Structures are given as C-alpha cells and as structure tokens.
Swiss-Prot record:
Belongs to the G-protein coupled receptor T2R family. This is Taste receptor type 2 member 40. Glycans are attached at N170, N179. The keyword Membrane applies. GO terms for molecular function: bitter taste receptor activity; G protein-coupled receptor activity. It comes from Pan troglodytes (Chimpanzee). It is a multi-pass membrane protein. One of its GO terms (cellular component) is plasma membrane. Its main location: membrane. The lineage of its organism: Eukaryota, Metazoa, Chordata, Craniata, Vertebrata. Several bitter taste receptors are expressed in a single taste receptor cell. Gustducin-coupled receptor implicated in the perception of bitter compounds in the oral cavity and the gastrointestinal tract. Signals through PLCB2 and the calcium-regulated cation channel TRPM5.
Amino acid sequence: MATVNTDATDKDISKFKVTFTLVVSGIECITGILGSGFITAIYGAEWARGKTLPTGDRIMLMLSFSRLSLQIWMMLENIFSLLFRIVYNQNSVYILFKVITVFLNHSNLWFAAWLKVFYCLRIANFNHPLFFLMKRKIIVLMPWLLRLSVLVSLSFSFPLSRDVFNVYVNSSIPIPSSNSTEKKYFSETNMVNLVFFYNMGIFVPLIMFILAATLLILSLKRHTLHMGSNATGSRDPSMKAHIGAIKATSYFLILYIFNAIALFLSMSNIFDTYSSWNILCKIIMAAYPAGHSVQLILGNPGLRRAWKRFQHQVPLYLKGQTL
C-alpha cells in the first residue's frame, strides 16, 4: 500500500503563519460567503415566493447554496486545524472534515459543469440531430441530473472515510536536554485510494466542461464565418454571448485546476501542517469558490442589477438605523 506520512509537534506552531493563514483565507472565505449568500438569497427568495425558477436559475441556486456550504466548512476546518489541533487531530473529526470537503468540492464542480452545459446548449448553434435532442430534453432532465450529481459526488467521497486517512497522537515524545515530553501528531494517507476516488470524482464533470468549451468555440467559429465581413459582426448579440460564455468557462477552468491541485496536495499530507506550501494550498482552495462567485455575479445582468440595488439600499438602511 502506497502511503504518505507526515508529523507535526506543538513546537511547529508559528503565530505569524497561523495569523496570516486565518486572515488571508478568512477574507477570501468571507468574500465568497457574501457572494454565494447573495446569489442564494436572490434565487431562494423567488423560490420561496412560489415562483417557478427557470432551469438556469435553479442550477445557480443549487451551485450557490453548495458553494456557500463549502466556504463555511472550509473556514471551520482552517480554524480547527490551526487553533484547535487536539480536537481536529482526533481520527473521526479529521476524516469527517476531509470527506465533507471532498463531497462539497465534487458537488460544486458537477453543478458548475451542468450550468456550463445548459448555457452551451442555449448559445451554441449546430444542426446535428443529437444536439437538437439534448436542447429539447435538457429542461426536463436537469432536475434529475442535479440529483444524480449529488449521489455521484457522495459515492466518490464517502469511501474516503475508510482506509484512506489515519491520524494518531503520541504524547510521550521526549525533548532532548529536558525531562519533559511533547505531543506529536502523525498523519497517514493511502495515496492509491485517494488518487482513485479523488480523480474519478472530478473526471466526468471536467470532461463536460472541456466539451462545452470546445462546442462554444466551434459554434463561434461557424458563426463568425457566417457573418463574413458584416460590419455589425462585432456587435452581434450571438457573438457577444459566445465570447462571454467562453471567457466565463476559461476563467472557471483556470480557477478550478489550481484548486484541484491544491486540494489534492492538502489531502495527501505531502507537506507539513505549518509549512509555507500547505498554507499556500489553503489560500488557493479558499480563492477558487470566492473568485467564481464574484464572476457569476458580474457575468449575470440580473444579479449585477440586484447587487447594485443592494449596494444602494444598505447605506440607506444603516442611515435609518442611526436616526
């Protein structure tokens, strides 16, 4: 069995590193929580009023809610892993944090992938019968596909609770030139199982993203050739929609690839708990959901207008409270 072992003692704690990690990742998480919470509140309020949400808005609600959960969970894990080490390094608590983190990451990726597939089918233009069939059926199938995505994410994250992570503590490590002892925390990771379940959980949605981006690029190329030398080509709404969707997909893929690498390295325990590389992984992991939540708001005209109204109303509300 291929395993990776790391250890850390109480002396490894650096107050500067702990403070720096908590502040930077905390700012990122709070930014993401505000963004995801805003999206959830907008679409959740419409759903609570009994309105039937369009398919795209329904996916956005699921994505923003799962992302809100992920960011809150990441903040909790950072606090526990850095400030409450005794509790965090209990085997059951450690495994619980890792499994739920992977589950929420996989769910987020699936929901984001379905969102891109949905907009690809709306924007791209092909004459193939299969494309027309998918375009007609996607609205009916989407609720079931979202539920299936949750089950698939669970099926590739729950096995991580068995025979992958193991944490134990030795409280009797002697300190040289001293009669006292110190605690030493040992983490063991089964790399074979981690690589299999982690990669299988992200493989299909990443392929969906790449296919959606490829179809959008091909559709844009066909549309550009069709427009020819039309002087209004650069202002054509279809071309703008294509370019906007391609930019959004590219932005997400860049963010997610960095996040996937950072999450895997963090899960594998390759780096020491308080090493600079491990801190960098935590910061990258917090940046991905925050960055994509901001991009979703900026890239959606309805959410952009709602955010501007929110910014205008908050000072008025605060002013009224002080009177």
